[in-house]
Regions:
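Alpha-helical lid/collar subdomain of P-loop NTPases
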Residues: 1-27, 43, 196-202, 206-287
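AAA+ P-loop NTPase catalytic core and its hallmark functional loops
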Residues: 1-216, 220
Length: 287
């Protein structure tokens, strides 16, 4: 039993920290994960959410920030091909040939209270690490050595700024960089797994407006394929994002089986009778 005098006890009794519900937000999160994330954000503990893609990691962080009433600046690290320009800034020529350093938005976001979300950090270029290291350790500073003249060369991270990262795991995620142990070690890891089937059923019913029987079949097929992926029988898993896609098609009038085929089959190679795609077809037909 949790004492009401501890931080966890206070959060559990405070309505402001209420766990998101399927009924109100259409979102399910394990209570331990929720309170741990809220505690870390409040205490400015760098946190990394680790789990399969499409599992709601980004949405979870946005929900937490909304509950806490703080800003959340999202950075898509997977598409940041030039980390120096994206995180520090660039020199721009003004009239008369004068060079002015244009600081990146990141430098302003870390200078104010709130959460800086490094989304899909596992897909970021390796050069990102050296830029982020001083921000994430006890220094809490961002060196901007490329700024010239009298421009500010070092930016302090605001005491109430918290870094949260998301990372996809699994060999099927193309573009995923092998994460530097020194980078991972600067974060508090929180692992997210797929939600229990009965909860995923409720999410599908709530968000898509489909029947419980259809939702149950979608979840059953998805979990069968997830189990096969865990056994390395197929090369890709099925995310909640994809089960929601199926649910939306069913809600819009597509036949349940056809909806599953349209969403799930393109994720796998082979034909309807051979290869991984054939395996998926058999799982769908044996629902």
């Amino acid at each position: 039993k949790t004492s009401s005098k501890t931080l966890l006890g206070k959060m559990k009794t405070n309505p402001e920290f209420k766990i998101p519900s399927i009924g109100s937000e259409g979102f399910y999160v394990d209570s331990d994960v929720w309170y741990l994330l809220m505690r870390n954000i409040q205490n400015q503990v760098n946190t990394m959410l680790i789990g399969a893609t499409g599992g709601g990691k980004t949405e979870l962080v946005l929900l937490a920030c909304k509950k806490l009433g703080i800003s959340c600046s999202v950075y898509d690290m997977g598409s940041m091909y030039d980390p120096v320009a994206g995180l520090l800034g660039v020199h721009r020529l003004q009239k008369g040939g004068v060079s002015v350093f244009d600081y990146a938005k990141f430098t302003r976001d870390i200078s104010k209270p709130g959460v800086v979300l490094l989304d899909e950090l596992s897909r970021a270029p390796v050069t990102t690490n050296n830029i982020l290291f001083p921000c994430l350790d006890s220094r809490r500073k961002l060196p901007v050595e490329i700024a010239g003249g009298e421009d500010l060369r070092e930016i302090e991270v605001h005491p109430e700024c918290c870094f949260v990262a998301t990372a996809n795991v699994g060999v099927e995620y193309t573009g995923t960089m092998s994460m530097d142990r020194a980078l991972v070690g600067r974060f508090f890891p929180i692992e997210l797994s797929y939600m229990p089937p009965e909860q995923e059923n409720k999410v599908l019913v709530k968000r898509c407006g489909i029947s419980l029987s259809d939702a149950t079949i979608i979840t059953k097929v998805a979990n069968s394929l997830r189990n096969m992926y865990n056994k390395q029988e197929i090369s890709s898993s099925i995310s909640t994002r994809e089960t929601l896609m199926v649910g939306d098609l069913v809600a819009d009038g597509w036949d349940l089986v056809r909806a599953m085929e349209l969403v799930l089959l393109p994720l796998f190679e082979g034909t309807r009778s051979d290869g991984e795609r054939g395996i998926v077809c058999r799982v769908i037909s044996s629902r």
